[in-house]
Amino acid sequence: VLDQTDFSNSSIDAEGFRANVGIVLTNNSGQLFWAKRIGMDAWQFPQGGIKPREPLEKAMYRELREEIGLLPEHVQIIGCTRDWLRYELPERFIRKNSRPICRGQKQRWYLLRLLGDENAVRLDLSDSPEFDNWRWVNFWDPVNEVIEFKRKVYSAVLSELEQMLKAPSGLQPGQ
């Protein structure tokens, strides 16, 4: 698993993509953790920016703690996507008054297995929580439920991560 990246002083690259880690958390039934953005009718996987010079795995664990209250001992890393996956933001989401302009996200995605009790999940540990609700969903449901501009990335992420779950020590998706 690639763990180091260098964004010098900005997490936005020369092409305008913000570096980000995404988290796909599975339970022992092969379902996926699905979180509702605070105050919105929008559901997604946890994700967040990578700080300059921050190793990917460290960023993932930081986001895991900030967004859903889990610690490294609560999860097992099953794998990570091989490459950066990108999506462009629709025009209405681009902040044109900030520099550098962020026109989208480039993400590395981690597949994690929850160890132990789901009661460890806490959405209220951050000063500015991202989510106000969560649920377990069937493996492929997020592709159709996420906001439209993220669907292609979600499909690619789940297609790649599904292979890791099918490995001898993994779960079968949807079981």
Task: Show where each model-derived region lies.
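Charged phosphate-binding loop/patch that engages nucleotide di/tri-phosphates or the phosphate backbone
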Residues: 139-175
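Unchanged
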Residues: 50-148
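Active-site beta-strand termini and strand-to-loop segments that position acidic
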Residues: 25-28, 37, 112-114
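A short gly/proline-enriched turn/hairpin at secondary-structure junctions
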Residues: 44-48
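A conserved beta-turn-beta hairpin within the catalytic core of GNAT-like acetyltransferases
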Residues: 39-41
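Acidic, metal-coordinating catalytic segment for phosphate/diphosphate chemistry
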Residues: 1-22, 28, 99-100
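A periodicity- and composition-biased signal for non-globular, repetitive helical segments
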Residues: 24, 53, 156-157
